[in-house]
Amino acid sequence: MKKVLALVVAAAMGLSSAAFAAETATTPAPTATTTKAAPAKTTHHKKQHKAAPAQKAQAAKKHHKNAKTEQKAPEQKAQAAKKHAKKHSHQQPAKPAAQPAA
């Protein structure tokens, strides 16, 4: 922590790196009597790459439509016919005029 503080102070004051190195060289080095164990072997995990999906248009990505059911488009109607649903009146077709017997 003190080294970091000294580095920040030295950088702020604009001291040369040689003067800073001389200052930090006076700190006692740790003793070499301690033995360190070899670091554990690191295993690198490989990512499994997925197959890239087929490219689609932007609208096809957003709107998922069911391709299985192909529905027929309804017949186009006039605007008034869409708004006003007519009730079916039960009219029988007109009978032909009775012909006199000859």
Swiss-Prot record:
One of its GO terms (cellular component) is periplasmic space. Its main location: periplasm. Keywords: Periplasm, Signal. Residues 22-41, 91-102 have a biased composition (Low complexity). Residues 22-102 are annotated as: Disordered. Proteolytic processing gives rise to the active protein. Pfam families: Asr. It is found in: Periplasm. It comes from the Bacteria. Residues 22-58 form a propeptide. Residues 80-90 have a biased composition (Basic residues). Residues 1-21 form the signal peptide. Required for growth and/or survival at acidic conditions. Belongs to the Asr family. This is Acid shock protein. It comes from Escherichia coli O17:K52:H18 (strain UMN026 / ExPEC). The gene is asr.
